[in-house]
Amino acid sequence: MERLTLPPGGAQAVDEYLEYRRIVGEDDGGKLFTPEEYEEYKKKVLPMRLQNRLFVSWRSPTGMDCKLVGPETLCFCTHRYKQHKTDFETVPQQRPIDLPCRVTGCQCKAYHYVPLNGTQPIRCRCKHFADQHSPALGFTCNACSKCSGFHSCFTCACGQPAYAHDTVVETRQERLAQGKPVGQDVPYAAMGGLTGFSSLAEGYMRLDDSGIGAPSVDVLDSPVSVMDHPFLRAMQPPSTSSPQPLAVGPSTQISSLRKPEEDDMAYFERQYQERIKMEKAAKKGKALPPPSTQPS
């Protein structure tokens, strides 16, 4: 593998370019804006983008967002979401909202998500792949004359067939009215339905219902308790203000490790007994004794 060497300031230049590409997307037509054009673009587009962001998802009949569309998510026309019209000075009043493809010569008039079967396109009932169909409304097959329009019986991970899902384009207010996450306002182009790291997972696997992803400051700054992971307890610095300091140091770290002679049941039983002792000591207001490091 070739080793890349950057000159002084090169890493910062790379970060600035990535920031530029996330904000501008495909709007520069492949030619970089000058610094003046870039600043003018941000003054014009960013307020509009923050106010009129559209959230795009692929929704099942049960109301679950099985797929949250992002900048790189492919459309039925095989072009990415970021290559479609996503910024509006005024949000259209008609529903559904059409997001036409901006690639020259493409017949796609509205963004339409189609799932993949692993890395391959799914098949229509005419036995041809999705990318063998026309992106024009009706989605007729280009490889046969019997197909009346793309219709796939591919089953989503939620248990519903693909044809029962809909590509939904909605505003922030419409999404909040349904109790769905909207995340934080970001200036980047074509963010679609992405609201956090958990948005990359499929709907049935998405455990973070907040959609923001990162825990709040209150959670991050909360004191380490006896119920936390042994690693957090071991790395917790001693506190002079807490009346019930946790025992830290090598003894705590050793206690959390499995001893060579211990089987599974003995290890978990020792961990359980140590936790019970720590909880009892905490209730009595005493300093927590360091856990035993002797073999049980």
Swiss-Prot record:
InterPro entries: Fam221a/b. Residues 237-256 have a biased composition (Polar residues). Residues 235-263 are annotated as: Disordered. It holds the Pfam family FAM221. Belongs to the FAM221 family. This is Protein FAM221A. The lineage of its organism: Eukaryota, Metazoa, Chordata, Craniata, Vertebrata. The gene is Fam221a.
